[in-house]
Structure formats: C-alpha cells, structure tokens
Amino acid sequence: MVETTTMMKVLVRVREFDVEKDLPAVEELERRCQVGLSGDMAAVHDHADDGDGAAAKEKKKTKTKTKKKKASMSLCVEQIGDPLARVRHAPEHVMLVAEYGEEEEKKKVVGVIKACVKTVSRGGKQEKPFVKVANLLGLRVSPSHRRLGIGTALVRRAEEWCVARGAEHATMATTESNAASLALFTGRFGYAPFRRPEFIGHPVHAHRLPVARGHRVFQLPPEVAAAAYARLLPPQDAEFLPADMPALLAHKLTLGTFVAVAADGASFAVLSVWDSTRSLSLRVSGAPALLRASLAALRALDRGAPWLHLPSIPDIFRPFGAYLLYGLRMSGPDGPALLRSLCHHAHNVARKNPACAVVAADISPDDPAAAAVPRWRRFCCDEDVWCIKNLNPDEHDADDWAAPPPPPGRHLFVDPREF
C-alpha cells in the first residue's frame, strides 16, 4: 500500500512500515518526538501538523505562553521494544510511514502513524452490542519537516485503510495542551472531543503498603475473571469494552485479576494488573535540582535505616516502567476501602519487579472508582482528550455517540494494550 503526494516540489510517499528497513529510523523519530503525558512537554513536542499553517499559528501561541511560565515538571513516555505493540492485539492493524525526498539514497522517514480496527462496545441499548471502531495513535512528524502537510497525509491514508476494513467510527487521543494535534483532527478531519479519562499514578515505595485487616484478597483464574467481568461490565453499561476481553485477561502481560471482599460479604472490589514495563518507558523531566537531591537523600536514608519505613520512592528522573490497573469495579458500602486495599496489593506485587516504579490507572474522573485509587500529584494527568469521528456520515445515526456527556452509570474502559 503506497500513496505518493507532491508537497512543495518534494515527493512524500506514504507506505506500510517495513521492520527490517524502517525500524532504526522510526526509533530515532520516536526519540526526537518525545511525548509528554502532561504539562508543557506535550505542547512543545506537538507531533502533528495541519498542512495549511493553522497548527503553526497555534504552535506559536503555545510557545509564547510557555516562555512566560517557569519550567515545570512533566511526565514523559517513550515506547520501547516492539513498535507495533500498541496495535498488534487487534486482528487488523497497520503502521504507516512517510518518506520524504526524491532520490532513493536520500529518502528519509519523517512521519509515522499506527492504526487498528477493533470490536468494542458502544454502550446503551443498541441493535448491535459491539461495533467496529478504528483507533489512530502514535502520530509523529519530524520536527524539521513540520507544516508540510505530512501529518495530514498520514491521517488521511490511515482513515482510508480503516474504512476499507469496515470501521464505523475512528478515535484518537491527545492532550489538551497539544494545540497542533487538536487543530489537525478537530479542524481538518472533523473529529469531536469525546471523553476525558484521567491518568492516576502512585510511586512504588520500598516498603509494603498495608491491606486493611478484615479484607480478604484473592486471585481469579482468567476464565473466572472473564465470567465476573461479563456480569460487572455488560456491553450496554460500558464504552470501548473489547469483545476479546477473555483474551486480554488471559494475556501473559496481565499479571492477574484480584478480588477483595469484606468480612461480612456485603461489599467487594475487583481489578486487573497489566505489566507495561516491557513496552513503555516513563521519565519525569524538568525537576529542580533541590528536589532531585532531596529524594536521593531520602532513598539513601531509607536504605541505611529501613526500620524507619520512610516513604522513599525510586529514581523517577531516569527511565522507569509502570503497572497499569484496569477493569476497576466496586460494590457495597465498603467498596472504596476494598478497592484501595486492592491498589495496595497491586503496589506490593509491583515491588517485586525492579523495573516498575509506578502503579497507575487510566479512568474516567466521574467514575466512583477514581476517588478510591491512591494518587501522587506528580504522576497524575487530567489533560487527556479522546476525540471521535463517524466514518460513515451518510448513514443516519439516531443516537449520536459523540454527543457529550455520557449518561450516568456508563463506564469508560481503557484498554491497557493501547496505552
């Protein structure tokens, strides 16, 4: 699959990713376009362009505002390992690259985008409980080749690929501060802001966190966990619940599904743990030297006097990994306390992995479970914006899925495989 476009008298060729030929160039592009989960990093390293200058204007405005503010800490994420890890779980997935240049020996990869078509729940009383939805992610354009329409060409070709495979809607995610990305998708391509999940993280301490007395925690086998989630998260009550939920729960990177129950049996909580340390590397940047020194001193003191149980945290200013919590549900008067105990249990599991420094969840802020998840402000981000587009505008849609907000009681499921 190849699409050739002439831009500013230079040939731009969009084609499928060739792992043997393109892997080094794509890895270098990812490093140059490092993405922040929050703060100014996302605005400075915006990774999209709209091809007609609108993004450039927004970018200039963002930079002007950024200069007036003091440098702040940002949580940055970099994909490691398999470049297709975030889409490979879908039966239909692709990675497209944009080549810039005319002469074969001088061509270089200047853009990349990933796309997949998956079957997920839409929520509500629909004729079909599951629909085919495309997910566009990982759009990167080389900083030295922006404002040339390369991002536009990549998105357009990715949408065409998804439509050809029966996708009814397309989704993408960015951050509120990434004005260029929002301008590209909501302006040129007609996406509408849709949902605002919140990233909630907590550092992994050197010491175990307590599980409340009277709370029993046990692990469910994958087949039992699938049956439990089928009752707790029916398709009509959840958005983006994957049709292959049993496969997700049985995946080798799902470390387990855990349930906590109270002594009286009137309340319970459940969550699953996903190991992302093999595919994602996070790092906190922009921290003051004094803070770095203080946390280093605290770690040294904790190593020398572990009986003090000081709340020391790993070195988060170097690349580290994370465990992701998904499928968080609770019920009963003691549900929040039980869910908090499960989060502590997940933290204690993470302590056994030296590569894991954070336990986190991506969850809708209006979900009651969000209030029960332990958080550290520096590891939280409420800037995420999900956008959606109907890929079949000619078909009448009586229930506009993009119309905000979702009805009360509808849960947003965030697939950890695509984080």
Swiss-Prot record:
GO cellular component: nucleus
Residues annotated as transmembrane: none
GO molecular function per UniProt: acyltransferase activity, transferring groups other than amino-acyl groups
Expression sites (tissue/organ): Expressed in roots, leaf blades, leaf sheaths, shoot apical meristem and young panicles.
The N-acetyltransferase domain, residue ranges: 12-210
EC number(s) stated in the UniProt entry for this protein: 2.3.1.-
Region (Disordered): 44-68
UniProt keyword list: Acyltransferase, Nucleus, Transferase, Ubl conjugation
Location in the cell: Nucleus
Listed Basic residues bias regions: 58-68
Matching InterPro entries: Acyl_CoA_acyltransferase, GNAT_dom, Plant_NAT
Name of one Pfam family that matches: Acetyltransf_1
Post-translational modification note: Ubiquitinated at Lys-63 by HDR3. Polyubiquitination of GW6A delays its degradation by the 26S proteasome and enhances GW6A histone acetyltransferase activity.
Function: Possesses intrinsic histone acetyltransferase activity and acts as a positive regulator of grain weight, hull size, yield, and plant biomass. Regulates postitively grain weight and yield by enlarging spikelet hulls via increasing cell number and accelerating grain filling. Involved in the regulation of plastochron (the time interval between leaf initiation event).
Further comment: Over-expression of GWA6A enhances grain weight and yield by enlarging spikelet hulls via increasing cell number and accelerating grain filling, and increases global acetylation levels of histone H4.
Protein family per UniProt: Belongs to the acetyltransferase family.
Subunit structure comment from the entry: Interacts (via C-terminus) with HDR3 (via N-terminus).
Stated name of the protein: Acetyl transferase GW6a
Organism of origin: Oryza sativa subsp. japonica
